[in-house]
Amino acid sequence: YKYNSDLFLILPGTEIAAVLFDEKDGYLKMHHLNGILGTKAMQEQAKSGLFQHMERIEPIVAYGDWDGRKVTEEMAENLRDHGCFITYNHPVWSRVESHEFEIDGIYDSLEIYNYNTVNESGTGFNTTYWDEMLRKGMHVNADAADDNHNGNFPDNFGGYVMVAAESLTHDNI
């Protein structure tokens, strides 16, 4: 990528969504997962190839009821099949129940701090689900993010990811 340097690295990624509405189009809950382009090995093992620049992934839309756990599994499988490192985003803001996303080994990181949703609705910080998963013996990392939308309130430079890596390369990060 043309902006990469010894001090800065761009990791391509995408966000996919699934939304559950009631019968009158009222929002009930949703899943948001990020797929960050994985290591060379993950890319080589991508069953479905890699996502293309600006490729749009249509959201999954359901009405009335859904099997939220199955939806999460399908979304994660889609990202994994495209060579991605996977994060599950802002579960409190999304109004999901723990059984819908607390699935061992399905994603790499759980977002425990989302600066945008902290400012928007006070629902962006929560370590309870992560702690619950760890107590169940699940192995999942945690992350913090800005989720920058440049909307009606400040949502940048409040959450960030720090990585202890040997070097600033895609595979090491």
For each feature predicted by the language model, list its residue ranges.
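A metal-dependent hydrolase metal-coordination microenvironment
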Residues: Y1-G83, N89, V96-S98, I103-G105, ...
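A short helix->loop->beta-strand "cap" motif at the edges of active sites that frequently abuts
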Residues: L7-F8, K136-V140
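Sec-exported extracytoplasmic/periplasmic mature domains
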Residues: R80-C84, R135-M138
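Active-site-proximal structural scaffolding
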Residues: I103, T123-N126, R135, N156, ...
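Short acidic/histidine-rich active-site segments
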Residues: M138-F157
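Aromatic- and carboxylate-lined catalytic core of secreted/periplasmic carbohydrate-active enzymes
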Residues: S167-I173
